[in-house]
A protein has these predicted regions:
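Interfacial segments of alpha-helical transmembrane regions
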Residues: 1-5, 47-66, 140
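Immediate flanking context of iron-sulfur cluster ligation sites
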Residues: 4-23, 42-45, 76, 106-107
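Membrane-interfacial alpha-helical segments at the cytosolic side of multi-pass membrane proteins
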Residues: 36-48, 136-146
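Extracytosolic (periplasmic/ER-lumenal) interhelical loops and adjacent juxtamembrane/interface segments
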Residues: 77-126
Length: 161
């Protein structure tokens, strides 16, 4: 439940930044989907359902958004190329319109952000970097929950420490 609450906090933070005018890029949006799944898995834990599959899906969700955050950080830092759909890499963009550069974006050009652009940093880390780190911590929480669940299944004793 703590890991799901952490995903909810990260997702809420992303929406707050967006409300404050920090428009997300496509890769930022991609990183939100696994958080939504993790939140859903946390909600399912409230019901008497098989716990292990829920914990595994929660862990995979946190790991996937962390991996996306690492990839996005690499794109922002120029360590590797990002998707051409949101970085414009490999194209002569000098003669292209906004709708040609980002066809899936809204017509409001002031809200368009390239995935290779860092729009906010704290302690030299971008939002994507923070998502990668914090989601990695959440993945560890999910994995600890899996280990504890398995320990109870195997030994019949809950670890209350």
């Amino acid at each position: 439940m703590t890991a799901a609450a952490g995903s909810a906090a990260l997702l809420l933070g992303a929406f707050v930044f967006q409300a404050l005018g920090y428009a997300p890029c496509a890769m930022c949006i991609w990183q939100r989907y696994p958080h939504a799944i993790a939140i859903g898995m946390g909600a399912l834990l409230l019901f008497a359902l098989p716990i292990l599959p829920i914990l595994i899906i929660g862990a995979l969700s946190a790991l996937s958004t962390s991996a996306l955050g690492v990839f996005h950080t690499g794109v922002e830092r120029g360590w590797w190329e990002g998707p051409t759909s949101c970085t414009g890499s490999g194209l002569d963009v000098s003669q292209m319109s906004v709708s040609e550069l980002l066809p899936s974006a809204s017509s409001n050009a002031s809200n368009l952000v390239l995935c290779s652009e860092v729009v906010w940093e704290f302690l030299t880390l971008s939002m994507a970097s923070w998502n990668a780190i914090l989601s990695g911590v959440l993945a560890c929480l999910w994995l600890v929950a899996i280990a504890r669940h398995q320990k109870v299944r195997w030994h019949g004793v809950a670890d209350v420490s």
